[in-house]
Amino acid sequence: MFILASQSPRRRELLSMLGLTFEIITADIDETMDPALSVEDAVAQVCKKKAQAVGASHPDQLIVAADTIVVVDGRVLGKPHTETEAKEMLRSLSGRSHTVMTAFCLSRGDRFETHVEHTHLRFRELSDAEINAYVATGSPMDKAGAYGIQDQAAIFVEALDGDYYNVMGLPLCALTKCLRRWGINVLNG
């Protein structure tokens, strides 16, 4: 049993798929990334702040927090705030390669373990009609980079190198290795 410090329905689905038991308590923090840090360090810092915020009121519980971003040409794409911003993000990814980074942090009390997973993707060229139709579904609005690989945006992905589940918001292979070190074994392996 642990606490998932995330409101992401995809993270909840992925952990449930593994048969893990957890409670959800969301962290209310400022998710602004520190521009003085590298992108990888900044996303890890945001993730650690989520774990610390929830852990402050649950010091004896194992906390799992995560944060996902998309990086294209050194530019960080978080969740779009408007449909116009979602369309701009998708245009910036069209026909290009990008990296999805998900940081996760396990914590209990003063002990922390943080990991950042990278998955590299390439989108095919997207037409304005496809972008408009996809944004009209509403799906992009709660996702970093304005797309969900597990939904209709799957048809945009021309190539993928790395953990597919990382793109959904939680790199399951890396996470379960860490969970094992914290005493939680999936499939009792």
Regions found by a protein language model. Give the residues of each.
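Cofactor-binding loop segments of dinucleotide-utilizing enzymes, especially the Rossmann-like FAD-
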Residues: 7, 27, 109
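A short beta-strand-loop structural module common to alpha/beta enzyme folds
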Residues: 23-31
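Generic structural marker for isolated residues within well-ordered, non-membrane alpha-helices
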Residues: 11, 30, 51
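A generic short alpha-helical patch detector that favors 3-5-residue windows
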Residues: 20-21, 148
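N-terminal beta1-alpha1 ligand-phosphate binding loop
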Residues: 1-20
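Anionic-ligand binding patches
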Residues: 2-3, 37-189
